[in-house]
Regions:
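Internal alpha-helical scaffold of NAD(P)-dependent oxidoreductase catalytic cores
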Residues: 82, 89, 119, 123-129, ...
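NAD(P)+-binding Rossmann beta1-loop-alpha1 motif at the extreme N-terminus of oxidoreductases
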Residues: 1-62, 70
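Alpha-helix C-terminal capping/helix-to-coil transition sites in glycosyltransferase folds
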Residues: 69-70, 189, 240
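NAD(P)-dependent Rossmann-like dehydrogenase/reductase catalytic/cofactor-binding core
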Residues: 197-198, 225-235, 240-323
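Electropositive phosphate-/nucleotide-binding environments in soluble metabolic enzymes
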Residues: 12, 16, 61, 77-80, ...
């Protein structure tokens, strides 16, 4: 590993952790946030949030131009639905040319169903390198030295290997992603299954999570195949490997959202899976792939169908072979 200048754009829970991690393993790090954001103000005043404390040698900045100019590698961790408008902002900065961008989000563009690397590439792809950083793990575990495995994916295997070499450690073991389509679809849709798992918890049907895991991976592997990816990727770290952290963990925002939704309770944290449910509705049409679980969630979230009635309808679907 060589010492790099790295900027992390986005100072939410995950972005702040990535900055903390990159600094911890020896890189020079700048963390960017919007000047008036609650997270940035808190970090500027205290250098800590609810999960971790930043080292004094990690620089904070609210200047996007400064953050881009500083770094060789730029990591983006913002809401997936804000990526297109944010990329348009970045595209106004001449210094983005030749940089390597790593997208550290798990989502799809709700209106188009496009993968985040597609969205970003459309706007700033020329003369830049684009990769994704995905897989299981919670900030609360990592900062307590509980290790996990993750994936780096890119259309350029040389870029993938370089990033893994610079970020691999005894806290996070990275694997080379070989299927960008499958990795991105898998990472985004595990949040959808997390919402479904939370709904099962709220309905006292938690024992159905095993069936959700089996059938959820099956329907999403069909989608990945239709999109030109490798169906086996769904059974790797980006999707199935992230189920423990998403379907069972008390830290999972998507699981907690699903549970709160069926119980009629308020939940004010970001649950990226909600927008991904919309994207899957679009992809199901585009690729003519049946996605019964994802479609059921769409009906519950956006058409006000009763969750328990919708689950019963899934059970009344025609009997078929498992594989």
């Amino acid at each position: 590993m060589r010492l790099l200048n790295i900027s992390v754009l986005g100072c939410g829970r995950w972005g702040t952790f990535i900055a903390w991690y990159a600094n911890k393993i020896g890189h020079n790090v700048m963390l960017w946030g919007r000047e008036n954001s609650r997270n940035y103000i808190e970090l500027s005043e205290t250098r800590k949030n609810d999960y971790l404390k930043l080292s004094e040698d990690l620089e904070l900045s609210n200047s996007l131009h400064k953050a881009i100019s500083f770094a060789e590698i730029i990591i983006i961790s913002i809401s997936a639905q804000e990526l297109r408008s944010f990329a348009n902002q970045l595209n106004l900065i001449d210094e983005i040319q030749g940089k390597t961008f790593i997208l550290c989000m798990k989502g799809l563009e709700a209106t188009s169903g496009k993968r985040l690397s597609q969205v970003f590439s459309e706007i700033v792809g020329k003369n830049t390198n684009i990769a994704v950083w995905i897989g299981p793990g919670h900030v609360q575990d990592f900062v307590n030295d509980i290790p996990n495995c993750m994936v780096i994916g890119s259309e350029n295997i040389g870029i993938t290997k370089k990033i893994v070499q610079e970020f691999n450690s005894d806290l996070i073991r990275f694997y080379y992603g070989q299927d960008l389509i499958g990795n991105e679809i898998g990472a985004a849709t595990k949040n959808v299954m997390g919402i479904a798992a939370g709904m099962l918890d709220g309905l006292n049907y938690s024992s159905l999570k095993g069936s959700l895991m089996a059938r959820g991976t099956r329907e999403l592997s069909r989608l990945v195949t239709a999109m030109g990816g490798n169906d086996l990727t769904i059974y790797g770290l980006s999707h199935l490997g992230d189920y423990e952290a998403t379907l069972f963990s008390l830290h999972s925002h998507n699981r907690k959202f699903g549970e709160a939704f069926v119980l009629g309770q308020k939940f004010d944290k970001l649950a990226e899976g909600v927008s991904t449910v919309k994207a899957l509705k679009e992809l199901s049409k585009q690729y003519d792939v049946e996605l019964p679980i994802s479609n059921a969630l769409y009906e519950i979230l956006f058409e006000s169908k009763d969750a328990k009635d919708t689950l019963e309808e899934l059970f009344l679907r025609p009997v078929k072979f498992e594989f």
